[in-house]
Design a protein with these regions (language model features):
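Terminal targeting segments of Actinobacterial cell-envelope proteins
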Residues: 1-14, 38-42, 55
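Hydrophobic membrane-insertion alpha-helices, especially the h-region
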Residues: 17-30
């Protein structure tokens, strides 16, 4: 079974600081361009019993317990480094280009500049490499559903495909879904070192707080690499 190890390398520690600042600052992944506006509430995450949870429950611990269901065994070898160019989630009808996301001056993670693109955090591995690759997108934009509006409705076993600059495609299978108050973001589970190629999809969730201009939660989808397709010749 894939393991999320407790050790952290230098890159993971830097990323953890960044995302912790993001969660504490409350900048989120959807409020950009939506300040003080009413917006549609996305569907809640389909959290399995015993899984990563924070929705309609007592405050989630910093490092929630793993799902009681076994995660899918990675069946593909890790891939070489190659920048992601697009993402496809067949079960949601999602197809989106991918842009780069770095860190802002305040050490919080940048967010996509529109509601149609997905961002890859450049401080994380590329999809298919060893470790957790992090992709983020808005849940709403200008009061309308955006790329990851239905991310919380994903189920274990569904697939996510990421095309890469070298023409290859990394195929991931969802192993867990969690929804957390932004003040309880599971930094270690999302950014911590793992012994296989993994993917994390992040957006906002829960109700929209008109006073702060933000949704109150984060939704995280955890997935493992199960297949890779070579570039077409």
């Amino acid at each position: 079974m894939p393991q999320r190890t407790q050790g952290r390398d230098r890159r993971a520690k830097g990323v953890a600081v960044a995302v912790l600042a993001l969660a504490v600052a409350g900048s989120g992944l959807t409020a950009y361009g939506l300040s003080q506006q009413e917006t549609r509430t996305p569907p809640p995450a389909a959290v399995s019993e015993g899984g990563h949870a924070g929705h309609h429950m007592d405050p989630a611990p910093t490092s929630p317990s793993p799902s009681s269901d076994p995660a899918p065994e990675p069946t593909a070898e890790r891939m070489s480094r190659s920048r992601p160019t697009s993402i496809s989630i067949p079960s949601l009808g999602v197809s989106s280009s991918i842009t780069d996301l770095g860190l802002q001056a305040d050490r919080t993670m940048e967010v996509p500049q529109d509601g149609t693109s997905t961002g890859w955090f450049t401080g994380s591995p590329t999809p298919g490499e060893l470790g957790p690759s992090v992709l983020a997108a808005h849940v709403t934009w200008d009061k309308e559903p955006a790329v990851f509006f239905e991310l919380g409705s994903m189920r274990e076993g569904q697939r996510v495909e990421v095309e890469r600059a070298d023409g290859s495609t990394a195929v991931f299978e969802v192993s867990d879904i969690g929804q957390y108050p932004k003040t309880k973001f599971p930094t270690d589970d999302v950014y911590g070192e793992v012994d296989h190629a993994a993917l994390r999809l992040i957006t906002c969730g829960g109700h929209f707080d008109g006073e702060t201009g933000h949704h109150v939660d984060n939704v995280v989808v955890y997935a493992e690499l199960v297949d890779e397709r070579a570039a077409a010749r």
